[in-house]
Amino acid sequence: MNISQTDAEKLAAGCHGNPFSVLGLHEVAGKLSLRVFLPGAETVEALDPKTGRVIVTLNQTETPGLFEGTAARRKKRFAYHLRITQGAHQWQMDDPYRFGPVIGDIDEYLLGEGSHRRLWSVLGAHVITHEGVAGTHFAVWAPNAQRVSVVGEFNVWDGRRMMMRQRGATGVWEIFVPGIGEGEIYKYEIIAPDGSLLPQKADPVGFGAEHPPRTGSVVRKIDGYAWDDAQWMTRRADVQRIDQPVSIYEVHLGSWRRVPEDGNRPLSYVELADQLVAYVKDMGFTHMEVMPVSEFPFDGSWGYQPIGLFAPTIRHGTLDEFRALVAACHRENIGVILDWVPGHFPEDAHGLGRFDGTALYEHADRKEGFHPDWNTLVYNYGRAEVANYLAANALYWLQEHHVDGLRVDAVASMLYRDYSRKDGEWIPNRDGGRENYEAISFLQKVNTESYGEVPGIMTIAEESTAFPGVSAPVDAGGLGFGFKWNMGWMNDTLQYMQQDPIHRKYHHHEMTFGLHYAFSENFILPLSHDEVVHGKGSLLDKMPGQGDDKFANLRAYYGFMWGHPGKKLLFMGCEFAQGVEWNHDSSLDWHLLDHPQHRGMQNLVRDLNALYRENAALHGLDCAAQGFEWIDENNAEASVLAWLRHGPDGGAPMLVVSNFTPVERSHYRLGVPQAGRWVERLNTNADCYGGTGLGNLGGVQSADIAAAGRPFSIDVVLPPLTTLFFQLDDG
């Protein structure tokens, strides 16, 4: 036997860390020797792949499954197929150990440095042609493993058969498996540093996954999709500027609409591309924000505990079918924002936790590496390879899937080491403080690389604290996000709206306080899924009163929101006043649209979107103080608020007035900066919205009567629980 007993024993035990050094073709004493390890085989022959003739018959060694033979007549390395006999069965296969490495020197250098921005082009499973043979290249990062194998039906899930090659000091293992391709299910089998066999792992850079609860990765081609959205991609940078309208429809794909006649299943990506896109277009939203689609094991996490960061969830279809949904949005000039979750990951055995038997992606110390709120693991942002893995994942969605923006989940939990931790449960930073410097650097890296590599996109932070500079540029010391959710505005205004109108005068500041900081960040006003779950009820539930009063309150609130500075976000179902809180296992209650009040609410949101989109006064200076001017800020007794919105072009301003009491206020005088007819552009009390129709008969003429420090004023009717929009008729 031309192999050491130690090597043979390691092969048989499946713990050889360098199988390519002993398997395949090797020169021994000036001759080419061929070795294969095929447990269960009885005879093995090497054939000429062109002629089918036997090149060499391999002999069984003392080690079961290990065969070797010498090609006495061959002087140069040669291609071959293996013919294997086992009982009555005979088959041919190519030998993975006859192929050279796939990863090149530049990729190897970038991997070793932890700076490969297109990490997904190297790691994962790629269908390729290598050395003239079609197959799939597998590569995975597991630097501390003793051995890594790819396993699947193609090798009867036997980790001894396809042990991988380690690439220098990169910690990456690779192997080219000839003859397998799209749709193949696989996992990685890893032996930890202590010699223990770990649970089989899904591919951290897998592009497809099995239907949960199955946990395998699936080979998917990521190249060659025929995009047809060039027109959108060309103009996207202009559409997504800060001075453009951004009105976002937040959607959970699994519960937007279901198919009751087919087991109440959720819609597929293909069906969503037809039905959802048409609906978002009809409603006038500029963007659709999709709750996380990266593959996740537990439905009840809503996608916020992902494991397959590079795989669109198979619950709705394949990777290319997800791309078709994005393309359908773009054809209708709708931007697509993905919820992205780099803050934590679940402890499921097939996931990233202790991936190679060590704390690889997470911190080893649970004070840093475990999240008490969600019982999940926290990424080690200070490790270059981990930060690169996540930053590359952001680029992957933006580049490979043409996604237009990323909304980063739970940013506050990343920024602070003591987030949801008691004294003694967290480790201070190097300066003794609570800020997580590594997470801050990571977020800056993500934003710098995302905006730098993919111009025209947007990034959005869900950040619930007063951390400074979230949407400030990185070179100015900020985190570099394009926008930040205004959680303070949401909490304050919802608190106000839940008050009985008779008590609102004591809470007036909750509606005005947000303007003290409204321009400190580039804000989005969010009424998200978080406000309609966990016993909070629906938005309609939160409104005081009974019947029509509830709807009137909510209509007035929506008017206030669309008239307020900041981009807009509304969770699905809220646009037609879903009556109960959201349930991820059920469809929205679309039957409610048979009722006039719900249909009226839908009409209102559609018209608010149109008014917002079409008037620069309502969006052009959303994030700039010069776009806002109070007219009536302090009338707490009447619970009335009035303000002007200005556009960047000096056009006609928009006057917004909200009356948050159930009292009609006739002859209410409002100061205005210019004389003329002020047209009533929208009245949330209109008949078509489910209101009484009381209003100002299309508009009012100003009078030369000074009011509120303005030389002119208008005398208006403020219907109960109503928001009005007036605009100067400039001819």
Curated annotation (Swiss-Prot):
InterPro entries linked to this entry: A-amylase/branching_C, Branching_enzy, GlgB, GlgB_N, GlgB_N_E_set_prok, Glyco_hydro_13_cat_dom, Glyco_hydro_13_N, Glyco_hydro_b
Enzyme superclass (EC): transferase
Record keyword Glycosyltransferase present: yes
Keywords: Carbohydrate metabolism, Glycogen biosynthesis, Glycogen metabolism, Glycosyltransferase, Transferase
SUPFAM superfamilies: (Trans)glycosidases (SSF51445), E set domains (SSF81296), Glycosyl hydrolase domain (SSF51011)
Enzymatic reactions: Transfers a segment of a (1->4)-alpha-D-glucan chain to a primary hydroxy group in a similar glucan chain
Protein name per its UniProtKB record: 1,4-alpha-glucan branching enzyme GlgB
